[in-house]
Each structure stands twice: as C-alpha cells, then as structure tokens.
Amino acid sequence: MSYTIPAQTRTEIGKGSSRRLRREGKVPAVIYGVGKEPVSIVFDHKDIINIQANDDFYTSVLTIVLDGKEVNVRAQAMQRHVFKPMIDHVDFVYA
C-alpha cells in the first residue's frame, strides 16, 4: 500500500520548539541517510496516527511531500508518549 504524508521543513530546532509543535498537534521528525544532509521536518499528528497503525507502515516505502517535492522514505524509529496515544518524534531514512 502507498502512503503519502504532507510535511514542511522545520526552521526552529530544539526542545522548546519541539514542545510548541506538539502542543499545536504537530509531530517533529527528521529524514537522514548516507551521503545526504539530514532534513528536519514537521507534519500534522492526524496525518500519521492512523496510517502508522497498519502493519505495513514500517516496511513499505512512504512518500513525504516536502514543500511541494516528493521524497521516498522508510520509517526508521518512532518515539511515542508514555501514556497518551500520541507520537512524539519520527526518524525516517531515505529509501
């Protein structure tokens, strides 16, 4: 199955800005890979919470629409809130 997630590039980096984003219902994330610069991104929590419940989310190639450009990635790691059904951060790897 194909998954598409709209995202924007993050300009503010750090714990404080990540907390502000989470309060607004957004998820900070990073895309990295060999030979490419890491890119900090942010997307809406509602865009990923339902698709990550599918079993093939972690093994399939995802498409992130980053500022109008499509990037193919795989989910590498996901940090979740301790007791709330929320995602705190996602690491993606270039596919």
From Swiss-Prot:
The keyword Metal-binding appears for this protein: no
Keywords, in A-Z order: Ribonucleoprotein, Ribosomal protein, RNA-binding, rRNA-binding
Pfam families in alphabetical order: Ribosomal_L25p (PF01386)
InterPro entries according to UniProt: Rbsml_bL25/Gln-tRNA_synth_N, Ribosomal_bL25/Gln-tRNA_synth, Ribosomal_bL25_long, Ribosomal_bL25_short, Ribosomal_L25_dom, Ribosomal_uL5_bac-type
GO CC term, one of those recorded: cytosolic large ribosomal subunit
Example of a GO biological process term: translation
This protein's record includes keyword RNA-binding: yes
Domain of life: Bacteria
GO molecular function: 5S rRNA binding; structural constituent of ribosome
Subunit organization: Part of the 50S ribosomal subunit; part of the 5S rRNA/L5/L18/L25 subcomplex. Contacts the 5S rRNA. Binds to the 5S rRNA independently of L5 and L18.
Family membership noted in the UniProt record: Belongs to the bacterial ribosomal protein bL25 family.
HAMAP family named in the record: Ribosomal_bL25 (MF_01336)
Protein name: Large ribosomal subunit protein bL25
Organism of derivation: Shewanella amazonensis (strain ATCC BAA-1098 / SB2B)
Chain's gene name: rplY
